């Protein structure tokens, strides 16, 4: 199940929650935009590796991403998600590091 909530379009602040079919895994991404064009980063939490790429169409926007992953047991990975709006595109992929 994929869920997202766009809190404010003007400041491009949003919260995105993704739940795998298994209730034992939850991923929450909180992104705050404030001033660069493109950023790509890799975050490792537990046995999960998260790759995040963001392209902003406005050069004055900067992306800061905080990723929180919580899980109770191993679930089928990888999975990916693409979110596109008028002002930016956000792509991330999740894979397990065995």
Curated annotation (Swiss-Prot):
Q: Which UniProt keywords apply?
A: Membrane, Transmembrane, Transmembrane helix
Where does the protein end up?
Membrane
Indicate the principal place this protein occupies in or around the cell: membrane
Gene Ontology cellular-component terms for this entry are: membrane
Q: Where are the transmembrane segments?
A: 13-33, 65-85
Membrane topology term: Multi-pass membrane protein
Taxonomically, the superkingdom here is: Eukaryota
Q: What is this protein called?
A: Putative uncharacterized protein YA5053W
At the highest ranks, the source species' classification is:
Eukaryota, Fungi, Dikarya, Ascomycota, Saccharomycotina
């Amino acid at each position: 199940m994929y869920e997202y909530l766009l809190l404010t379009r003007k400041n491009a602040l949003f919260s995105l929650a993704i739940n795998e079919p298994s209730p034992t895994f939850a991923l929450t991404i909180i992104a705050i935009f404030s001033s660069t064009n493109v950023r790509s980063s890799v975050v490792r939490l537990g046995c999960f590796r998260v790759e995040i790429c963001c392209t902003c169409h406005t050069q004055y926007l900067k992306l800061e991403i905080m990723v929180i992953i919580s899980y109770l047991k191993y679930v089928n990975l990888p999975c990916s998600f693409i979110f596109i709006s008028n002002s930016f595109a956000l792509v991330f992929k999740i894979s397990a590091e065995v």
